[in-house]
Structures are given as structure tokens and as C-alpha cells.
Amino acid sequence: MTEFTHINSNGEANMVDVSNKRETVREARAEAFVSMSAETLAMIVSGEHHKGDVFATARIAGIQAAKRTWELIPLCHPLLLSKVEVKLTALLDTNQVRIESLCKLTGKTGVEMEALTAASVAALTIYDMCKAVQKDMVISNVRLLEKTGGKSGHFKVE
């Protein structure tokens, strides 16, 4: 079994030393879902939400969150991201919004946490903007879809 990289021999949490790692192109994709009523989703899709463009706000929030992941997750490195993309899709058949994020850089450590943070914060932003009309929305299935680059290689959800 692979060992935890953020825990030293004394069991203490530490930031991983990436000084001697080589730079590679690294990319990660993550997703999250927000389930809601058909009425709430229709309000978002039609642009009739009183707070404005929910998708645009969630997209910007997700991008901003990816850039600030190192401030939110204690042992994450500050990264110079070369690309952050957040796509939101209304799934009318299931009354959900699907959020997919992509983060990319050339660096010494991966961008999985940045992609997961982008998707999560975009989902939280949708909840925040819509909670006045529906409080029982559900954020679910936040997960890493794919990552490339680095020593551990390629991972993709089956």
C-alpha cells in the first residue's frame, strides 16, 4: 500500500517537499452535481433569477477558488495555474446542474485539489445564489474524474 505523503515518520502533518521533483505538464478534471427542483432549475436556465446569471457567477467563483486552493487546504502548495476552466450544464431530465472543472499547469505537484475545489465552490455558489427560493438543494458526487502527469501517472474514472 502507498503511504500518506503528508505525514512524516512521527505521524505529524507536513507539507511535501517537491524541491527535487521534475516539472511536468499536469492536468486534472473534477465534477460535482447540484440537485434541485424543476422550478429552480428553470429559473436558472431562463435567466429569471433575481440575483443575476447564476452560471456566470458560479463559473467565476470556481475559477477564483482553484487559484486560492492553497489558502483553503492547509498542506497544498501555491501553484501557478496555466488554465482553469469551469463548465456548468443544466440536466433538465434529472433536475441537476453538472459542474466540470479542469485545471492545468507545468509544475512539480498535481492539480487535483484545485480541480476539486473549483467544482466544489462552483456548487456552493449555486446553492448560495438559489437558497432563497429552495433550501433543500443537494450537492453530491464531488469527485476526481481524471489526472495526468507526475510520478503517479494517469488516472481516469472508469
From Swiss-Prot:
InterPro entries: MoaC, MoaC_bact/euk, MoaC_sf, MoCo_biosynth_MoaA/MoaC, Mopterin_CF_biosynth-C_dom. It comes from the Bacteria. Pathway: Cofactor biosynthesis; molybdopterin biosynthesis. GO terms for molecular function: cyclic pyranopterin monophosphate synthase activity; GTP 3',8'-cyclase activity. Substrate binds at residues 75-77, 113-114. It is an enzyme of class 4 (lyase). This is Cyclic pyranopterin monophosphate synthase. It comes from Mannheimia succiniciproducens (strain KCTC 0769BP / MBEL55E).
